C-alpha cells in the first residue's frame, strides 16, 4: 500500500560550535562551545526526492554554514544567533520552515540555558 506523506523533516541534533557570545564583555573574550538543534522542513517531501541528493537539504552543508555563521562575529544574545540561523537556512536552502534551539552552558547551577525560534519561508 502506498502512503500519503504528511510531514518530512530533517533533524540535526546537538551540533557543537564555538562562538563568542554573551552580554558581559568579558564573556565574549574567549570562545565558548554551544549546542544547536535544528529542525528543517524541506520544500519537497521525502517521497518526491527519489533518492536524489539535489532534491533535498544537504545537512552537512547546513552544519558547515551554521558553524561559519556562529564564528563570523561576536554577539551578545543567543537569541540573535538563533534567528540568524533560521533566516540563513530559509534563504540559502530549499526549506519551508526552520526551527533552531541553542543551548549555552554558562550558569553553574543549571545544565544549560536555551532559546528556541521557528520561522517559515515567505514566498520566493
Sequence positions of predicted segments:
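N-terminal, polar/charged subdomain of small-to-medium soluble alpha/beta proteins
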Residues: 1-124
